[in-house]
């Protein structure tokens, strides 16, 4: 996935980033421990991208992400994603995760069952652990069996996941 540009922006959980191509977002970055580390992570993920002002469609996506993280019920389904280079199974997992409404959760096994692969819960978890579009592909809404929080690969780990779920629940 080749990004043309990226930008950082403020949210209730910290300074996030997005990178984009002509076809949509190619990546979303949750906050690192500092703005510098978030920027460095974006440069690491998208070395050919320039930090620049976003085009109008990306500005709209950023505004929707900010609103969702403020607790507004928005599924972000209208945000275009450029999944060029995303493995077919991962793409299917991300598409299934995008159907989980804000404030709701599913287990990894539930997502696997929706894909017609009920024994693929671990593979679903691995795909979500590599999710290049956190928030827009709401991997935070997918839990381990029995309602356990499961893992979360973003900075802050499961505490960040719990915070995102609480924001969606209006807490």
Q: Positions of the model-derived regions?
A:
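Active-site and channel-lining beta-strand-loop segments
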Residues: 18, 142-144
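N-terminal alpha-helical segment
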Residues: 93, 144-145
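Regulatory, non-catalytic segments
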Residues: 120-131
């Amino acid at each position: 996935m080749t990004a043309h540009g990226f930008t950082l922006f403020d949210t209730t959980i910290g300074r996030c980033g997005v990178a984009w191509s002509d076809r949509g977002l190619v990546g979303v970055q949750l906050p690192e421990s500092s703005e510098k580390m978030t920027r460095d992570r974006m440069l690491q993920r998208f070395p050919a991208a320039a930090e620049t002002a976003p085009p109008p469609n990306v500005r709209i996506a950023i505004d929707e992400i900010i609103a969702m993280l403020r607790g507004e019920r928005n599924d972000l389904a209208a945000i275009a994603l450029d999944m060029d280079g995303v493995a077919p199974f991962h793409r299917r997992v991300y598409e299934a995760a995008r159907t989980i409404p804000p404030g709701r959760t599913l287990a990894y096994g539930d997502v696997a069952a929706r894909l017609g692969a009920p024994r693929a819960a671990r593979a679903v978890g691995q795909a979500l652990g590599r999710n290049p579009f956190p928030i827009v592909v709401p991997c935070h809404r997918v839990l381990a069996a029995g309602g356990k929080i499961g893992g979360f690969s973003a900075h802050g780990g499961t505490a960040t996941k719990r915070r995102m779920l609480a924001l969606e629940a209006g807490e």
